[in-house]
């Protein structure tokens, strides 16, 4: 099964996340199929959230299931996601 989820990177006490498409059997920060964007929860810059909406829609159409946090971020960028 493929999920759209967050993968942590950044230094200690300064988290940043990649929004990635990954197989559920892979570790959180392990290999992924495709990166869809990035998210800075500390909002240190104007573009703290960037998502490739076209590719996100493609993966959702292919059956990728977003995690709860990824679902919230995708919806904030206008990606249409059906109910669970």
UniProtKB/Swiss-Prot annotation:
Q: Does the keyword Lipoprotein apply?
A: no
Q: Which GO molecular function entries does the Swiss-Prot or TrEMBL record give?
A: structural constituent of ribosome
Q: Which InterPro entries match?
A: Ribosomal_bS16, Ribosomal_bS16_dom_sf
> Which UniProt keywords are listed?
Ribonucleoprotein, Ribosomal protein
Domain of life, per lineage: Bacteria
Pfam name, any one: Ribosomal_S16
Record Gene3D superfamilies: 3.30.1320.10
Positions in coiled-coil regions: none
For the keyword Lipoprotein, the answer is no
GO cellular component, alphabetical, reads: cytoplasm; small ribosomal subunit
Family, similarity comment = Belongs to the bacterial ribosomal protein bS16 family.
Protein name (database record):
Small ribosomal subunit protein bS16
- Species per Swiss-Prot/TrEMBL record: Deinococcus radiodurans (strain ATCC 13939 / DSM 20539 / JCM 16871 / CCUG 27074 / LMG 4051 / NBRC 15346 / NCIMB 9279 / VKM B-1422 / R1)
Gene name linked to the record = rpsP
């Amino acid at each position: 099964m493929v999920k759209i989820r967050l993968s942590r990177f950044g230094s200690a006490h300064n988290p940043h996340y990649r929004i990635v498409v990954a197989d559920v059997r892979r570790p959180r920060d392990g290999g992924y199929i495709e990166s869809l964007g990035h998210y800075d929860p500390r909002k240190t810059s104007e573009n703290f959230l960037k998502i490739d909406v076209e590719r996100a829609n493609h993966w959702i159409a292919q059956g990728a299931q977003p995690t709860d946090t990824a679902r919230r971020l995708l919806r904030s960028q206008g990606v249409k996601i059906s109910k669970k």
